[in-house]
Curated annotation (Swiss-Prot):
Listed InterPro entries: DNA_pol3_alpha_NTPase_dom, DNA_pol3_finger, DnaE2, DnaE2/DnaE/PolC, DNAPol_HHH, PHP_dom, Pol/His_phosphatase_N, Pol/histidinol_Pase-like
PANTHER family listed in its UniProt record: DNA POLYMERASE III SUBUNIT ALPHA, ERROR-PRONE DNA POLYMERASE
Organism of this sequence: Corynebacterium diphtheriae (strain ATCC 700971 / NCTC 13129 / Biotype gravis)
Subcellular location field: Cytoplasm
The name this protein goes by in its record: Error-prone DNA polymerase
Keyword Ligase annotated: no
Keyword terms: Cytoplasm, DNA damage, DNA repair, DNA replication, DNA-directed DNA polymerase, Nucleotidyltransferase, Transferase
GO molecular function: 3'-5' exonuclease activity; DNA-directed DNA polymerase activity
Pfam families per UniProt: DNA_pol3_alpha (PF07733), DNA_pol3_finger (PF17657), HHH_6 (PF14579), PHP (PF02811)
Length: 1039
């Protein structure tokens, strides 16, 4: 019998509908339609087999290192095989439950939820939840076991306690392994036990079934059949087998005696199983499913209520109290507009019922301010005057023309989304505060599902197939050399979940235990607990997420602010900085942006002179412009040409003008593409947001296909057809998936301006702030200090009598800190600073309590030269000095050093770079005379070269970068003593030149491309520069 069926309007089934499906009678409201699955968009048919059957012990790939397929694929297979219901069982968790629920709801397939509990390594208890109450009880039990143990250890209570705590809210699925000890069976309530006849097609099935038969006759337990599948078909079963071998740290050949002959079992419907087991066992599976199935439409916890009688009145009071301080120095016109806007925003917040959300965000931000932690709201919160007044954001929305409706409107579903960037060195303190304030049960971080990428997939595929680790590691970096079998298995693993990680900063906060909705467990990082879902599943369940993100530039800005106070006595408030200083924009237009947030990359430095920003919105554009979305959508060059008056502003269709007017007809921001969906295809705001989320999700193929059909239908209603329709869809796909939201661009643009402001007005403090916040940004300390020298700043070397632990500003110069010296830890550096100054090395050793290794590190770095000894002499004295103790007479163990020659310039640079990563000059400077004889020009001369001229260029490699949007082309960053240069390396040259891949300093022959104030070199030959290995500070390679 064949029929088609879908859910009602894609929504989860009601109980009456669900019961009808389980009993074989199909409600009238079901549509005859295509259903389910996650394939390529082809139509899927739902079959009903002649033998009813519900698979109640299947595993998706969220049973980590066990299952082979996604929940969507498992649901599709169940539908195609005519199953009455499906249970996807994870180990010690509900990792894939929400994805499973969403896929099944779309397909109209009833769902059963459960988990395997690891009571002991050889004792696994499978539990099926009966309805919402059973799900909640099981989630709490898993949480208790996870939190009682550690990241990799789960500690459940004794079996009797599990049975008691679950009561009648579950069914215990017991296979043959539970029947060998009848004392265990006595612990269960008889009416909660279901014996599981595994139909695995292995010879031992016969013996297992005979044992189950005997127990069934003796106790009268209910019994069902199950294929126990961990794959959708035989091909995928091999992948599941490989994963299961990896889980046991074995190869497939080693694990073969314990694995299924085909690797694993796979999905089989009732008709196929009917020849292997009693029909009653198949019928009983439907009965158990009817007893347990429910739609996972959980009632998510609310946000904690703020402890005040009236949350809205409290929020209004906070805004009124802080208004004057935040708007100090603004014009009366701006103040009046801000007051009116606040009245409007508070009305919307009240109407939508979100005052509690703003109070929680304000609480977190206030903690940061109270504890001198720099933070800033990111995203569309920058459009809100309320957020600005509360101190959540630092961009004043009235003067910058930002629209509140892009942040919050009456059409929006769910709470607003405020991401909080926090200086990276203090983010842990903020997260700890959230745990302490809201409770470990009610607050947790969001998970990040770690999936297989190419290298890891190749490595694990090789290990699974029995190859040694050395081969696995080699093939992970050179995939073409791997055997076909390894590459085939790796390709199947790619994109699949491997284990659970932790989101960069997402936290959920609830008014009751999160375990009512999803289990929590310990993260790898000490003191962190995470929910078992990623941000998409949390959003689907209605859990409210707060993003607390670490940002290195905020840490650097904090250092800059503190340094300005130290050097000038002036306190800088970021929100009071004038965003319209022409000098700042001139500096950026000249490409002078090394160290400036977000615009210091190779591509950004090449774009700035072309765009020539003149106002704040230009920086917003600059942040969004050099991104995969605009690049793939072909927007970068058209926008710049139009911005500079070299190309007319046009629109591909008149209906697009409203969405694209502000960016001259060229789509740049993610929101614009959503507006196109609204204007051109008639989407609602909610549909446009659903489209955005679907395109950004790895699991929304079906939703994307549905939205695509809806989009083209909407275009036809507006008479937009043919090529234009296809172009619009392609732009949306490129931008919504990879484009940068304007709301984020606004927030990041403020940090661009703030950091550029410090570079222009307080350059020494700027560079020292960056040094203190390392590692961060695009450039190494060596490149940052070279840029400082080009600004005619003086760099003072490490000095045990003058250096502090970190870099400092000393009379307008940059003094390097002791923490930059390799081999000198923070404790040793603090001891050196605390007891300074020193008379000699022995004095240093005694009073600072330093060992031989630390003194030798100081000697090699030149930090001891202030004592009147060269580096070689200091190394000679280090051993003897370190043997002196504080109680000994000074000089008792000193050995006179012989007369040793000082280091030459080359040796000093080598020693500096080896010990500190920075040198007093660029190594290439030592070769300049020889290079000039060969016709090699300095980087500073590139802008003076004629376009298309062939030149020679030499430099230290600062970066190797191969963006996904560059079709395999690699970009080298080179630096000599005069500046930076960008070198373009073709795919062919990269393949045939070893130097371009590994050399630390290179000599390049190539052709200059010089236009619009930007010069680059396209290389045709690359060779290693002499002595490069010893002279280079190393490169920062990006792939």
């Amino acid at each position: 019998m064949v029929d088609w069926v879908s859910g009602v309007n894609g929504k989860p089934l009601k109980w009456s509908q669900l019961e009808g499906v389980l009993s074989g009678t199909y409600p009238q409201e079901f549509k005859l339609a295509n259903v389910g699955g996650s394939g390529s968009g082809s139509e899927k048919i739902r079959y009903y087999s002649s033998q009813p059957f519900a698979e109640l012990h299947a595993a998706s790939y969220y049973h980590f290192l066990h299952g082979a397929n996604s929940p969507q694929d498992m649901v599709a297979a169940a539908c195609q095989q005519g199953m009455s219901a499906l249970a996807l069982i994870d180990r010690d968790g509900f990792y894939g439950a929400m994805e499973f629920a969403e896929a099944a709801a779309t397909s109209g397939l009833p769902t059963v939820f459960g988990a395997e509990l690891t009571l002991a390594p050889d004792r696994i208890l499978t539990v099926l939840a009966r309805g919402v109450e059973g799900y909640t009880s099981l989630s709490r039990l898993i949480t208790q076991a996870r939190m009682r143990g550690s990241k990799d250890v789960t500690i459940y209570p004794p079996l009797a306690e599990i049975v008691e705590s679950m009561g009648k809210n579950c069914r215990f699925l017991l296979n043959h392994s539970w029947c060998t000890d009848e004392s265990l069976l006595e612990i269960f309530y008889p009416d909660t036990v279901v014996l599981e006849y595994g139909v695995t097609m292995r010879p031992e099935d016969v013996d297992h079934h005979e044992l189950l038969d005997s127990i069934r006759q003796r106790y009268g337990f209910m019994a069902i059949a199950s294929a126990v599948p961990s794959a959708v078909d035989r091909v995928s079963a091999r992948v599941a087998g490989a994963k299961q071998a990896l889980a046991q740290r074995e190869s497939l050949p080693q694990a073969t005696p314990r694995l299924h002959p085909m690797g694993s079992t796979w999905m089989r419907g009732g008709d196929e199983l009917a020849g292997s087991v009693d029909k009653q066992l198949l019928d009983a599976s439907v009965e158990v499913a009817r007893d347990c199935a429910f739609a996972l439409d959980l009632v998510a916890p609310n946000l904690p209520r703020w402890p005040v009688p009236d949350e809205m009145a409290h929020l209004t009071g906070l805004v009124n109290a802080r208004f004057d301080a935040r708007y100090r120095g603004r014009s009366e016109d701006v103040k009046n507009q801000a007051r009116a806007q606040i009245h409007h925003e508070l009305a919307v917040i009240k109407e939508l019922g979100f005052p509690g959300y703003f109070l929680i965000v304000d609480d977190i931000v206030s903690f940061c301010h109270t504890n001198n932690i720099l933070c800033q709201g990111r995203g569309s919160a920058a459009n809100s005057v309320v957020c600005f007044v509360l101190g959540i954001t630092n961009v004043e929305p009235i003067s910058t023309g930002l629209l509140f409706e892009r942040f919050l409107s009456r059409d929006r579903e769910g709470p607003p989304d405020i991401d909080i960037d926090i200086e990276s060195g203090r983010r842990d303190a903020v997260i700890t505060y959230v745990y302490d304030t809201y409770g470990r049960d009610n607050a947790a971080q969001v998970a990040n599902v770690i999936t297989y990428r190419t290298k890891a997939a190749l490595r694990d595929a090789a290990r699974a197939l029995g190859y040694p680790n050395t081969s696995a590691d080699a093939w992970s970096t050179n995939p073409d050399e791997a055997p076909n079998a390894v590459r085939f298995l790796a390709e199947q693993l790619k994109g699949q979940p491997r284990h659970l990680g932790i989101h960069a900063g997402g936290m959920v906060i609830c008014d009751r235990p999160i375990a009512d909705v999803v289990p929590t467990e310990w993260a790898r990082k000490h003191g962190r607990s995470v929910v078992q879902w990623d941000k998409e599943s949390c959003a689907s369940a209605g859990l409210v997420k707060f993003d607390l993100l670490g940002l290195g530039m905020l840490e650097a800005l904090h250092h800059m602010i503190d340094l300005v106070v130290e050097t000038t006595g002036t306190t800088i408030n970021l929100w009071e900085i004038d965003l319209a200083e022409p000098e700042i924009y001139t500096m950026l237009s000249n490409g002078d942006a090394v160290g400036v947030f977000q615009v210091e990359s190779r591509a950004q430095l090449a774009t700035l002179p072309r765009l020539r920003p003149r106002e704040f919105f230009d920086l917003v554009v600059e942040v969004a412009l050099v991104r995969p979305g605009p690049i793939q959508g072909g927007s970068v060059h058209p926008y710049i040409r139009r911005r500079n008056g070299l190309e007319a502003v046009t629109y591909e269709h008149p209906i697009l003008e409203r969405s694209l007017r502000k960016t001259l007809g060229v789509p740049l921001f993610q929101e614009q593409l959503m507006h196109i969906a609204v204007d051109a295809a008639g989407f609602s705001g909610g549909e446009a947001d659903e489209l955005r989320r679907a395109m950004g999700s790895r699991r929304s193929v079906d939703t994307m296909n549905r939205m695509k059909r809806r989009f083209f239908a909407g275009l036809r209603r507006n008479n937009i057809t043919g090529d234009i329709a296809g172009i619009l869809w392609n732009k949306i796909v490129a931008f919504v998936a990879y484009g940068f939201p304007e709301s984020h661009s606004q927030s990041f643009a403020s940090l661009v301006y703030f950091s550029a402001w410090f570079k222009y007005h307080h350059p020494a403090e700027f560079y020292v702030g960056l040094l203190r916040a390392q590692p961060m940004g695009f450039y190494s300390p060596q490149s940052l200090l070279a840029d400082a020298r080009r600004k005619e700043l003086t760099i003072l070397s490490h000095n045990i009598n003058k250096s502090q632990v970190e870099a400092t500003v000393e009379n307008g110069a940059i003094r390097l800190g002791l923490n930059m010296i390799k081999g000198v830890g923070k404790t040793e550096a603090e001891a050196i600073v605390a007891h300074a100054p020193y008379r000699d090395i022995a004095d240093l050793s005694r009073r600072a309590g330093l060992g031989v290794a630390v003194i030798e590190a100081l000697a090699r770095s030149g930090a001891l030269e202030t004592l009147g000894v060269g580096r070689r002499q200091a190394l000679w004295q280090a051993g003897a000095a370190a043997t002196e103790k504080a109680a000994m007479l000074p000089g008792l163990s000193m050995v006179s050093a012989p007369s040793l020659p000082g280091m030459n310039a080359f040796e000093l640079i080598v020693a500096d770079i080896a010990m500190t990563g920075v040198s007093s000059e660029n190594p290439v400077a030592l070769l300049r005379r020889q290079l000039e004889l060969r016709g090699v020009i300095p980087a500073s001369e590139l802008l003076n070269c004629e376009n298309a001229r062939r030149i020679l260029l030499a430099g230290v490699v600062t970066h190797r970068q191969r963006p996904q949007t560059a079709a395999g082309v690699t970009f080298l960053g080179l630096e000599d003593e005069t500046g930076l240069a960008n070198v373009v390396v073709s795919v062919g040259l990269w393949k045939r030149s070893r130097a371009v891949k590994v050399a630390r300093a290179v000599l390049v022959r190539g052709v200059v491309h010089n236009a619009d104030g930007v010069a680059s070199v396209t290389a045709d030959r690359v060779e290693e520069l002499p002595f490069a290995e010893m002279m280079s500070a190393g490169s920062r390679d990006f792939r």
